[in-house]
Amino acid sequence: MGFRVLVLVVMATTSALPFTFSEEPGRSPFRPALRSEEAQALRHGLTLLLARRADGQPPDMRQPEMRRPEVRQPEFAELSVGQRRWDVDQCMYYCLTGVVGYSYTECQTMCT
């Protein structure tokens, strides 16, 4: 989200600059630029976005957050420590001897 705000600020400031570069001979390299409706709309949108952010409201452009449902395994919590250790060892054995060829750290990450 911070990157989008930074991009909007850069776009608004560069489009709001009062001068553009001109390479016509005999003229000043800078001439006044016209402020377009698009630049004004962008500045207005940025102002609203920053005002909402200051108020603590989520901006309209942001996607609603999707929460994943928690996957709970009650049978694992009810197992004894020795039984859990056996399951981890068995998982490690099948992971390391499998056809896929996982490394030890990959298997350890998946099994624990």
Swiss-Prot record:
Residues 62-74 have a biased composition (Basic and acidic residues). Residues 53-74 are annotated as: Disordered. The keyword Cytoplasm does not apply. GO terms for cellular component: extracellular region. Residues 23-85 form a propeptide. Disulfide bonds join 91-111, 95-107. Expressed by the venom duct. It is found in: Secreted. Keywords: Cleavage on pair of basic residues, Disulfide bond, Ion channel impairing toxin, Neurotoxin, Potassium channel impairing toxin, Secreted, Signal, Toxin. GO terms for molecular function: potassium channel regulator activity; toxin activity. Residues 1-22 form the signal peptide. It comes from the Eukaryota. Belongs to the conotoxin R superfamily. The cysteine framework is XIV (C-C-C-C). This is Conotoxin vil14.5. It comes from Conus villepinii.
